[in-house]
Amino acid sequence: KLFGVRLSYLPASWLEFGLTRLTQFGGRGRDQSFPGVVFDAYISEPNQTGNRDVNEQAMADFRLRIPSIPYLIPFPAGLQLYGEAGTEDKWSQLPVPSRTAFLGGLYIPQVFQGDTLDLRIEYADTDYGRRRHPELRQVWYNNSPYTSGMRYRGFPLGHHMGTDGTDLFVRTTRYLTDTLQL
């Protein structure tokens, strides 16, 4: 079973902050029920054992929308800078938990005037914690009580690269019609 909470705050039309928390609980052989186990996980000390043991992820993110500025930002719809930092299970170890992952990107919703071409460039890193602490391997999307980890049918519930990876992603798309995207 999976429970998630997301809180977004838009202090201005050009700036957004978000917090997300995912909790995996229950499953075969685990007598845990909603909402009790999730409530306990949210108010108790993290990383409890026994019937309170759950698999958790916590993330904080931002999005900065910069409007088009002639000669400086020449894109008709402006551009967006975004980022996310997350932690797996050991979220209480602030300011930078040992099991941290990062994602950062640039999105240009309209590259040329009168065209539907967009561009996204993104970098993600789920290996940062292992590089800081070599004993931490296979941390993201994995958990000892939940042997398949934070996954659905083998695929991580999060970034496609999975655990212990870095990824540079570049994508451009164009709408050929209102419903057909290339």
Write out the residue ranges for each language-model feature.
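Signature for the C-terminal beta-barrel architecture of outer-membrane proteins
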Residues: 1-150, 163-170, 175
